[in-house]
Curated annotation (Swiss-Prot):
Transmembrane segments: none annotated. One of its GO terms (biological process) is methylation. HAMAP family: CbiD. The lineage of its organism: Bacteria, Bacillati, Cyanobacteriota, Cyanophyceae, Synechococcales. PANTHER family: COBALT-PRECORRIN-5B C(1)-METHYLTRANSFERASE. Keywords: Cobalamin biosynthesis, Methyltransferase, S-adenosyl-L-methionine, Transferase. Pathway: Cofactor biosynthesis; adenosylcobalamin biosynthesis; cob(II)yrinate a,c-diamide from sirohydrochlorin (anaerobic route): step 6/10. One of its GO terms (molecular function) is cobalt-precorrin-5B C1-methyltransferase activity. It comes from Prochlorococcus marinus (strain MIT 9303). Belongs to the CbiD family. Its EC number is 2.1.1.195. The keyword Methyltransferase applies. This is Cobalt-precorrin-5B C(1)-methyltransferase. SUPFAM superfamilies: CbiD-like.
Amino acid sequence: MTLPVWVAAAARAATEALLGRPFSAFQLLELPDRDEPFAVSVTSAAVLAGGEQALSISHCDPGPGLDLTRGLEIWVCVQWQELVVGVDDELNVHSEAWLNLVAGKGVGTLGSGGEACVSRFARELLSRNLYPLVPSGRGLRLEVVLPRGRDLAARTSNAAFGVVDGLALIGTQADVQVSASPDQLQQTIEQLRRQSAASDFCGAMTLVIGENGLDLARQLGLAVQPLLKIGNWLGPVIVAAAEAGVEQLLLLGYHGKLVKLAGGIFHTHHHLADGRLEVLAAMAVREGLPLDLIRQLGQADSMEAALKMLEAQDPELVRKLWYRLAATVEHRSAAYLARYGSWSIAIGAALFDRQRRLRWAGPQGSQQLAVLGVTPEDSPISLSLP
């Protein structure tokens, strides 16, 4: 189950405690994407502050896949509050007028001090399962705390999408979509085939890594051609695109993910393969960076730290390095594809940074973006790959 499901279970248990009901270790949740209620376990629930508040704890279990939220402790604290003035409760049965969702420690917000980053699915899940418990004429203040949220968020690309201070409560369904699983790969390939078989398909497609990358692609106006969100099986999806007759394929992703392709790593799940800093250091050698600087790159804590270090010393050098990297992604992707057959397909790469800025594209990527009326912030340069 995705993180929002475990938050909703704890929220329901806390609300029942606030109502004076006995604790139940399993909460029956109404899930938007299921016909029958689903039992979700919670660890504990108790009233606080003389019965004015209630706290419940649950632990996230995302299923058999590899997921950093496994075992994540979730605290939900609830208390009654007044309804928002001027809102007709009868007309807002499933609105959020009665629900005040507060981002506690470890929950990601949209910018420092901003509102909690919560998906529509997560909000609907809370609304469905809490509204029936809230007495008429009352509102509910609900604070979510993820004690390890900020530490875990440092291992994600949340900051690339403006999410700071913790984990976002995102998800579009109850079940975890395991991006490293063969089943997820098959679903992605089937969707690709449907898109390429459409009567209005013009031969061009954009592969986007992750849900947030998909949102960025739409903001950039790339939805004029098919967009396909993919997980970690980049290599097989590239081959499937060629087999389906795609002629112009654009890979759009966060630089910390696509850098792996420049190293020939085409299954990118972090539990299976990393090597990002090593690839960056190799690119730096080819670009002729000083040896001391290359050593510092290899010792950096993260890709973002390496990028900041380089930009502080020589912004122009950074521009050349990252365009070499984008061009190498294109080159290695074409080489990967050539192992499996011969197709007439141009593969472009476009990379964005943690500030959600489209920064770099390789030669093919720059051409494909230009057709769509999009230009990376850093202008392209000519490169000659070895």
